[in-house]
């Protein structure tokens, strides 16, 4: 990577956790990686061998930290210090933490007059995390949730920190392990046309900063996981 200040963020979702497996809401709440979740993080790390990261970041949730450490080790970037950023922590679901995902999504859909979140998306052509964020914020009376503006401001601050730190190093490639809603919202902030319905565990979305602007490449890409499996003799 030339020292032009170009920054390539490998924005990665953490490996599958216990709460993911149970299909329960996991925002600020946390649970450890499952065996499958750790394995996919190992695969990702092997797939990223040869990528010389100049820095590594994770949210301050254990699942992101655990994933990042596995990826750093397997990709031979374990010499880096892992920086923890609360700014890229997942959206907090307040009283809905630990609830079944489908229960919450159905409540969100009904708040907008639809029977399911799928029918809401299909009939409105919406694919925007703000729908869920702002509806959950309104339904949660505990005051523990954020609205979309506050959530976006927090994420922007995290991106700014990563960008400034990396440019101070002359630019380069950076590993960032975060969460599903975080990745959705960052994509929407930069290029909504690149957003996906689902961000898979251990997928990589490239966030590039060059010539004064951000762009999104390869959203939700599982290429590195698949490459890592093949490198280890897997299918």
Task: For each feature predicted by the language model, list its residue ranges.
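An N-terminal RHG(E/S)-centered segment typical of histidine phosphatases
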Residues: 1-53, 61-62, 69-73, 77, ...
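Acidic, low-complexity terminal tails and accessory targeting/binding regions
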Residues: 1-7, 91-103, 164-172, 184-235
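Short active-site segment of divalent metal-dependent hydrolases/proteases
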Residues: 17, 182-183
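A mid-sequence, solvent-exposed acidic-amphipathic segment
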Residues: 138-169
């Amino acid at each position: 990577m030339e020292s032009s200040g170009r920054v390539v963020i490998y924005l990665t979702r953490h490996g599958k956790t216990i709460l993911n497996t149970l299909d329960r809401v996991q925002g600020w709440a946390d649970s450890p990686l499952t065996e499958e979740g750790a394995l996919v993080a190992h695969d990702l790390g092997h797939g990223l061998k040869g990528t010389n990261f100049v820095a590594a970041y994770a949210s301050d949730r254990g699942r992101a930290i655990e994933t990042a450490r596995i990826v750093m080790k397997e990709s031979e970037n374990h010499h880096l210090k892992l920086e923890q950023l609360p700014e890229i922590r997942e959206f907090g679901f307040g009283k809905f933490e630990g609830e079944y995902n489908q229960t919450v999504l159905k409540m969100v859909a009904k708040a907008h007059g639809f029977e399911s979140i799928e029918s809401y998306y299909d009939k409105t052509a919406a694919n925007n995390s703000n729908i869920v964020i702002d509806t959950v914020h309104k339904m949660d009376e505990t005051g523990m949730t954020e609205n979309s503006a506050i959530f976006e401001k927090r994420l922007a601050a995290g991106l700014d920190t990563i960008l400034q730190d990396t440019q101070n190093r002359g630019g380069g490639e950076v590993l960032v392990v975060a969460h599903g809603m975080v990745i959705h919202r960052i994509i929407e902030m930069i290029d909504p046309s690149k957003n996906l319905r689902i961000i898979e565990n251990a997928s990589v979305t490239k966030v590039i900063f060059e010539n004064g602007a951000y762009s999104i490449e390869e959203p939700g890409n599982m290429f590195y996981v698949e490459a890592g499996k093949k490198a280890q003799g897997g299918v």
